[in-house]
Amino acid sequence: HPGSVFKPVVAVAALSEGVIDENYTFNDPGVITIDKYSYSNWYFTQYGSTEGTIGLTRAIARSTDTFFYKIGELTGIDDLVKWAKKFGFDKETKIDLPGEISGLVPSPEWKKRVKNEIWFLGNTYHVSIGQGDLSVTPIEENQAISAIASGGELCSPKIAAEPKCKNMDIKKDYIEIIKEGMIDACSTGGTGYTFFDFTPQVACKTGTAETNV
C-alpha cells in the first residue's frame, strides 16, 4: 500500500471535481465512526489530540487522515479511481527496464468481481489515505508525484530515452496549493521532520501504511 503518499492524488481529484475549493476547511474530530467501525486520524490514535479546523495545505502537511476520509467521500470512489488512473496508477509506466508490473486501483466493480462483496464507504476511506486494496509500485508513485512537481505534466519514466509527456489539464492553482502543502510537510510543524533544516528547501509527503503480513 502506498499510504499517505497517495493523498496528493486525492487532493487533485477533490479539487478538480469541484467538491472542494482552495478555501475548504474541515474540523478534525479525531475519529469518524460509521455504525460499529471507527476511522481515526494518526494524531488522535497516537496522542489523543485533534488538529482543529484545517484547510488543504495544512491537511497535507500534517497528513490528516480524517480530512482525506471526508474529501474522499465527497469525491466518490468512481472519480477517485478516474483520477488515480489519470496519474498512471493501475497500469505499467513502460519504463525501459525489464520486469515491471502494475499496481491495483480497486473499484466497486473490481471488489464484486474478485471478492463477490459490495463496496462500503469504509473502502472509500481506505483508498483516500492510500490503504485498503490499493497497491502501487514505487515507479508509479514516482511518476505521479513528478507530475505534480512539473506542474501537471505526466511523463513516462525513462532511463536511456526521452520521456513522453502529456499535459493533465490540472489547474495551476490546484497544483500550487498541493505543492505548498508538501513544502509545509517538510517544514517545522509538518510530518517530514528529517527535512526541517534541510537546504535547499524541498517538498515532500510522508507515508506510513498498515498491511497484514
Residue locations for each model-derived region?
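Beta-lactam-recognizing serine transpeptidase/beta-lactamase-like catalytic domain environment
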Residues: 1-4, 12-213
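Short, conserved phosphate/pyrophosphate- and ester-handling motifs at nucleotide-, phospho-/glycolipid
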Residues: 7
